[in-house]
Amino acid sequence: MATPSGKAAPPNPQVSKRSLPRDASSEVPSKRKNSNPLPTLPRPSGTFVEGSIVRIAMENFLTYDICEVSPGPHLNMIIGANGTGKSSIVCAICLGLAGKPAFMGRADKVGFFVKRGCSKGLVEIELFRTSGNLIITREIDVIKNQSFWFINKKPVTQKIVEEQVAALNIQVGNLCQFLPQDKVGEFAKLSKIELLEATEKSVGPPEMHRYHCELKNFREKEKQLETSCKEKTEYLEKMVQRNERYKQDVERFYERKRHLDLIEMLEAKRPWVEYENVRQEYEGVKLIRDRVKEEVRKLKEGQIPMTRRIEEIDRQRHTLEVRIKEKSTDIKEASQKCKQRQDLIERKDRQIKELQQALTVKQNEELDRQKRISNTRKMIEDLQSELKTAENCENLQPQIDTVTNDLRRVQEEKALCEGEIIDKQREKEMLEKQRRSVSDHITRFDNLMNQKEDKLRQRYRDTYDAVLWLRNNRDRFKQRVCEPIMLTINMKDNKNAKYVENHISSNDLRAFVFESQEDMEIFLREVRDNKKLRVNAVIAPKISYADKAPSRSLNDLKQYGFFSYLRELFDAPDPVMSYLCCQYHIHEVPVGTERTRERIERVIQETRLKQIYTAEEKYVLKTSVYSNKVISSNTSLKVAQFLTVTVDLEQRRHLEEQLKEMNRQLEAVDSGLAALRDTNRHLELKDNELRLKKKELLERKTRKRQLEQKISSKLASIRLMEQDTCNLEEEERKASTKIKEINVQKAKLVTELTGLVKICTSFQIQKVDLILQNTTVISEKNKLEADYMASSSQLRVTEQQFIELDDNRQRLLQKCKELMKKARQVCNLSADQAVPQEFQTQVPTIPNGHSSSPPMAFQDLPNTLDEIDALLTEERSRASCFTGLNPSVVEEYSKREVEIQQLTEELQGKKVELDEYRENISQVKERWLNPLKELVEKINEKFSNFFSSMQCAGEVDLHTENEEDYDKYGIRIRVKFRSSTQLHELTPHHQSGGERSVSTMLYLMALQELNRCPFRVVDEINQGMDPINERRVFEMVVNTACKENTSQYFFITPKLLQNLPYSEKMTVLFVYNGPHMLEPNRWNLKAFQRRRRRITFTQPQ
C-alpha cells in the first residue's frame, strides 16, 4: 500500500457544533469547546492549473459535522473504508460548483445532502485562479429546500455561479470530467452521440461544440429549404400544366355563354306567353259563369208554387191524423174489455182442469197405498222366516274381550313407535339444519380462500399451477408440504397485513415450505424441470422456532407504543411459522403505533432493536463498526395486496370434522328411522286384522235383535197405512158439482164477449177509411216533395257550378296579375313603367284594365309554350355539353398566370438562400470536422497505447453512417481483452463490469493528457476489476496524472492493492471515521511522520 509523504494532507473529518469560519485561511474548530484552535492544514506544493480545486470545506454535510480537505495539484488518491465519507467529498464538489443533485444519482432534492437532524448545511470550494482564487460558498436550507450562494463572501445568484464555473471550463454534469460512484455504470450506457458531445465539451476547443450545434441547425435548415424548394418546384410545374389545359376551357366557356344568353331570352319570353294563355282562359271562364248565374235565377223562381201546395197538404194531413188517433183510442178501450172477458173464461177453464187433476191424484194415491201395504206384508213374512231358520246365538263375549285386549296392546305399541318416529324426525331435522349451517360456513371459507387463490393466479400464474399440482399429488411426499406462505398465513386483523407483506419478501411469500429435503427435490424436479414452472421452495428448520420466546418482553416495549410482535399478528402452520421465525425473526420484530414514530429517536437510542415498525414506516437499525453509533434508515410501508383476506384454516378443518360427524349421525338416525317405520307398518297390519275380527264378532252377536226390531217396525207401518184410507166416490161427486157451477159462469162471459167484438169491428172499419184518405194526401205530398227535391238538387248543382266558375275566374285573374308581374320583372320593368314604343309588338289588355307590353326582341322567338320549351331543351342540351366550366374560369386563369410569376420569383430566392446555407455548412464543417478528427485521433492514439500496455487492444474512432447527418456523428469505443476475440464496441451488455470499468478509466486517462478541463473526478471505478487490470490501470493513472501541465485528478477508492507505484506529485488523502478518532486539535502530522520513520528504521531486516 502507498505510504503518505510530507505532501500528504489527510482531510481529518471532525465533529463539532460550531459554525465553519468564513475566511479560507482561518482555523478549523475542534470537537471540544475548551480545546485550542487547529491551524489551517498545510497545502501541497506544486503548480495548480486554472480552475483546479485548492480547498474543500463542509459543515453538517452528509456524514460530516465539519471537515476541510486540501487536495494537491495533480493526482489525489482519496482512500477510506466504506461509509467513512469518501463519496461525500465528491458530492460536495458537485453541489459546491452549482451541480444538480441528480448528477450524483442519489437524491432529487438538495436538502437530502444535509446531515440528518440538522436544518442547515454548508459547502465551500476554493478554486485556483492566477488573478486571485475564487471561493464559492453554498448554504443549504433543509426546511425551505433552498440554497444561498456566495462568491468571495458576497451573496450572488446561482446563475452567476454557473457562469463563473463555466468560464473555467468546469462541467460537473459531463461524465467525461465528473464521474460519481452512482454514475459509473451510466458511462458505458452513453450512446456514441452522447459520448461525442461529452468529449467535445471536456477536451475540445471552446468553439468545437458550438460549431457542432451550428452544423446540426444548419443541416436541419438545409433539409427544410430543400424540401420547400422541391415542393414549390413541383407546385409550379403543376400550375403551368393546369394553365395550358385551361386555354381550351376558356374558348369553350365563351361558346357556352352564347347558348346561355339564348336560354335567358327564351326564359324571359316564356312568362309573357304563359300570361296570354291564362288571360284567354280567364275570358272563357267568365262567359260561362254569367250563363250559369242566369240558370240559377230561373230555378229559384220555379220552386215557389210547389212550396205553397206542400204547405196546404200538410194542414189536411194533420186533421186526418188527429181523427185516426181518436179511433185508435176507442179501438184500444174495446179491445181491453174483450181481453178481460177472455181472461175470465180462461181462468174458469183452468179451475175445471184443476178439479179434474186433483181427483186423478187422489185415485193414484189410493192405488199406491194398497200396493205398499201388500209389499210390507211380504217383507214381514221373509223376516219371520229368516228369524226361524237362524241358529241360536252362542256366547261370543269372551272372544270379543280377548280381541279387545289384543287391540289395545297393539295400539299402545303403535303409539309408542310413532312417538319415537317423531323424535327421530325432529333429531334428523335438527342435524340437517346444523349440517347446512356448517356447510354454509365452509363455503364462506372457500370463497375467501378462492379470493386469495385468484390473487395468486393473477400475479404468479406459475405458482398457482404448482399449487394445483401439489393438491393432486400430495401422496407422493413423505412429510408435510405447505402451500405458498401467502395462502397459509391467516391475519388476525386485516389492518396489520401491511406489516407482514413489507417484512417478508415477495419471493418467500409465494414459496412452498417443506419439512424434508427429499420432498423438496421431488417437488422441484417435477415442477421446475418437467413443467418449466418458476416457483420458490424453502425448508423449515429441523428444530422448530415457532414457539421461540422473544429476547425482550413486550411489556418492556409498551412504553414506546409497541403493541405486538409480528409473530402474534397472524396464524400459520408450524413449519411456516418456524421458517419465518428463523429467517425473518418475526418473534423479535415489534410493531408500534403513531406514538412510536413520535418517540423514534428515543426508541432507537434506548431499545437497540434491529428492526421496528411504526404505524406507516419500517425502520432498520445498524450499529457502525467505526463509531459504535446506531445508523437508522426508514421506508414507507407499501399497501398490502395479498394478506387482506383472512381464512382460518384450523377452524375450517374443525368445521369439516363436524360435518363428517353430522353425516355419520344422520346415517345412524336414518337407519333407526327406517327400522321404526317397518315396525309401525307391522303394527298397523295387526291392528287392522284385530279390528276386522272384532267387527265380525259384534255383528254375529247383534243379528237376532236386529231382525226382531225390523219385524216390529214393519207391522207398525202396516197399521199406519191401513188407517190412512180415502172415499173415492164421494170425491168424484164433489168434483162434478163444482164443474157444473163453473160452466154456467163461463156461458155468461162468452155472451158479453160477443157484443164487445162487434163494437170493436165497427171502430176498425171507420179507422181504415180515415187511413185511406191520409194515404192519398201523403202520396200527393210525396210527389210534390220529389219534384221540389229534384229542382233543389239541380239548383244546388248549378249554384256549385257557379261558385266553382267564380273561384276559377278569381284564380285566373290572380294568376294573370302574377304572370304579368313576373313578365315585367324579367324585362326589368316596374309596375307603373310604360314600355317604350320601339320595344312593343302588341298591347294586350290585362283583365283589370292595365296594359302590358313585351319587348320587340321577342318577335324572332317562338310564340307557343311547346315551341319555347322545345327550343329551351335543345339549347340547354348544347350548353350541358360544355361540362366542367364555370364563370370563374377566365378569372382563375388570369389569377394563376400572376401566381406562376410570383412563385417563380419566390423559388429563385429560396434557391439562393439554400446555396448560402450550403456554403455556411461547408465552412463550419471544415472548422469543426478537421479539428475533431485530429482530436479523436489523439484520443485513439492514447487509448490504443494504454490498451497495448495491458496486452489488450482498443481503439476510438469517429463514427457516422452519413457524412451530412451531423446529429448522428458519435465516438465509438471498441475493445478486445482476449487475443482469441475480435474488437467489439463498448456496450453495457457485451463486456463484463470490470472490463467496462477498465475501458472507462483508460478513456478518461486519454482525455486527461489532452488537459482541457481543470480537474477530473472518478469515484470507485476500480470496483469489479481483477487485480492485474487494477494494478495496470493504477500505474497508468499515476504516470498520466502526475505529468507536468496536466489537470488535477481525484481518484476515490475504498481499497488498493499492495506494492503500488508512488509519485512525488501524488497526494494521498486518507478518510477515517469512528468513535476512537484522534481529536483534530491533537493531530500532529510531523510527529506522525517521525514515529513512522522510527518504526520503519527499527524493524528487523
From Swiss-Prot:
Job description of the protein? Core component of the SMC5-SMC6 complex, a complex involved in repair of DNA double-strand breaks by homologous recombination. The complex may promote sister chromatid homologous recombination by recruiting the SMC1-SMC3 cohesin complex to double-strand breaks. The complex is required for telomere maintenance via recombination and mediates sumoylation of shelterin complex (telosome) components. Required for sister chromatid cohesion during prometaphase and mitotic progression; the function seems to be independent of SMC6.
Q: What is its main location?
A: nucleus
GO CC annotation, single: nucleus
Per the record, the coiled-coil ranges are 207-440, 645-753, 780-828, 888-927
Q: Can you summarize the PTM annotation of this record?
A: Sumoylated. Ubiquitinated.
Keyword Isomerase listed: no
Q: Where is this region: Flexible hinge?
A: 441-644
User: What positions are modified (Phosphoserine)?
Assistant: 25, 35
Reported tissue expression: Expressed in testis but not ovary.
Arranged from A to Z, the UniProt key words for this protein are: ATP-binding, Cell cycle, Cell division, Chromosome, Coiled coil, DNA damage, DNA recombination, DNA repair, Mitosis, Nucleotide-binding, Nucleus, Phosphoprotein, Telomere, Ubl conjugation
Question: Mind telling me which Pfam families this protein's record contains?
Answer: SMC_N (PF02463)
The listed locations are: Nucleus; Chromosome; Nucleus, PML body; Chromosome, Telomere
Per the record's keyword annotation, is Nucleus included, yes or no?
yes
Q: Name one GO biological process term.
A: telomere maintenance via recombination
Tell me which residues bind ATP. Answer: 80-87
GO molecular function terms listed in the Swiss-Prot or TrEMBL record:
ATP binding; DNA secondary structure binding
Q: How does it assemble?
A: Forms a heterodimer with SMC6. Component of the SMC5-SMC6 complex which consists at least of SMC5, SMC6, NSMCE2, NSMCE1, NSMCE4A or EID3 and NSMCE3. Interacts with NSMCE2. Interacts with SLF2; this interaction induces an association of the SLF1-SLF2 complex with the SMC5-SMC6 complex. Interacts with RAD18; this interaction is increased in a SLF1 or SLF2-dependent manner.
The gene for this chain is Smc5
| UniProt similarity note | Belongs to the SMC family. SMC5 subfamily.
State the protein's name.
Answer: Structural maintenance of chromosomes protein 5
- Domain comment, in the record's words? The flexible hinge domain, which separates the large intramolecular coiled coil regions, allows the heterotypic interaction with the corresponding domain of SMC6, forming a V-shaped heterodimer.
Region annotation (Disordered) maps to 1-44
